[in-house]
């Protein structure tokens, strides 16, 4: 049995930018995940379920657990003095860590993805993304350090809190998964160099919004539902409503996750920096693909911290099919 800490140290030589700081940073995220795991499992026993009454910068009602997870991760990262600052889906602006101007890294995160599912005991997750800062070390970080394209990520990953708690991450040298053993208090290696299955047979989308989807996406959904034995169709529809949970299932079983633009969200709804970029990095490292329907996610130059984007991620052949339908059936 190999722990996450042992694995990170063992694999440092494979990663050109590996430093003790990055190892400690991943350890801080691991600690934050343990705290969130503990409190999610007793959320119904303490008063951290439901809405907090506040809204985030996107105008969405924040759940109590969103704010709890955000504060715990922020505290874990700041305590190590190895992160110059963070950007979070739950923060209006970047958070600059005073006294950490010497740190080389910044972290972007969605502290609790799918938190509205907590009340009904459905899987949720934490998503994180790590970049090297671009401003001079020794000075406070600025927004410029966070507005980098996804292809500049040095590490990314997620934690899924389900029937078991798993941490999945990449540093650009494959995707590795670790299951949390609460009796020992450690994450143990369970899958090394994960890959999408050769063929995917599942599509994950909120079909309740079908009437609002672009023409190309509507055509793709019908394509998924048609019978064709040569391509193993019809595909199976599975949608949890938590990006982390849907992505994790599709990574293991093969499939595609779709969150297209709609009339109410013409640019898409998922956040480029906190959700799309880290999941795209993981997908590509696992042999998959991630796109906004026209462009590779990791090549998009971000313009703002909370920028949204359409998002299609999963098996390469399935994402390429979506792109083809979007090209062939443009909206009038």
Curated annotation (Swiss-Prot):
InterPro entries: FBPase_C_dom, FBPase_class-1, FBPase_N, FBPtase, Fructose_bisphosphatase_AS. GO terms for cellular component: cytosol. It is found in: Cytoplasm. It catalyses: beta-D-fructose 1,6-bisphosphate + H2O = beta-D-fructose 6-phosphate + phosphate. Pathway: Carbohydrate biosynthesis; gluconeogenesis. Its main location: cytoplasm. Keywords: Carbohydrate metabolism, Cytoplasm, Hydrolase, Magnesium, Metal-binding. Binds 2 magnesium ions per subunit. PROSITE patterns: FBPASE. One of its GO terms (molecular function) is fructose 1,6-bisphosphate 1-phosphatase activity. It comes from the Bacteria. HAMAP family: FBPase_class1. Belongs to the FBPase class 1 family. NCBIfam families: PRK09293.1-1, PRK09293.1-3. This is Fructose-1,6-bisphosphatase class 1. It comes from Salmonella arizonae (strain ATCC BAA-731 / CDC346-86 / RSK2980).
């Amino acid at each position: 049995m190999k722990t996450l800490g042992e694995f990170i140290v063992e694999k440092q030589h494979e990663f050109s930018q590996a430093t003790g700081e990055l190892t400690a940073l991943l350890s801080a995220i691991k600690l934050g995940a343990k705290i969130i795991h503990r409190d999610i499992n007793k959320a119904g026993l303490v008063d951290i379920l439901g809405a907090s009454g506040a809204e985030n910068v996107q105008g969405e009602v924040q759940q109590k657990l969103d704010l709890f997870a955000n504060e715990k991760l922020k505290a874990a990262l700041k305590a190590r003095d190895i992160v110059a600052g963070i950007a979070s889906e739950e923060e209006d602006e970047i958070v600059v860590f005073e006294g950490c101007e010497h740190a080389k890294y910044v972290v972007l995160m969605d502290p609790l993805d799918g938190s509205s599912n907590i009340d009904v005991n459905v899987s949720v997750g934490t998503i994180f993304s790590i970049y090297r800062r671009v401003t001079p070390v020794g000075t406070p970080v600025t927004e410029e350090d966070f507005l980098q394209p996804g292809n500049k990520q040095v590490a990314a990953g997620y934690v899924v809190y389900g029937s078991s708690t798993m941490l999945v991450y990449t540093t650009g040298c494959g995707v590795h998964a670790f299951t949390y053993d609460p009796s020992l208090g450690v994450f143990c290696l369970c899958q090394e160099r994960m890959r999408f299955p050769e063929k995917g047979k599942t599509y994950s989308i909120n079909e309740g919004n079908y009437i609002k989807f672009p023409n190309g996406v509507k055509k793709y959904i019908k394509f998924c539902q048609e019978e064709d034995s040569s391509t193993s169709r019809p595909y199976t529809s599975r949608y949890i409503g938590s990006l982390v949970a849907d992505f994790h299932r599709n990574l293991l079983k093969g499939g595609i996750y779709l969150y297209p633009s709609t009339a109410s969200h013409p640019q898409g709804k998922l956040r480029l920096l906190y959700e799309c970029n880290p999941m795209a990095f993981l997908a590509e490292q696992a042999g998959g693909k991630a796109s906004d329907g026209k462009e590779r996610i990791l090549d998009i130059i971000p313009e703002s911290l909370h920028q949204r984007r359409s998002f299609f991620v999963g098996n390469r052949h399935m994402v390429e099919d979506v792109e083809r339908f979007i090209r062939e059936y443009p909206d009038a």
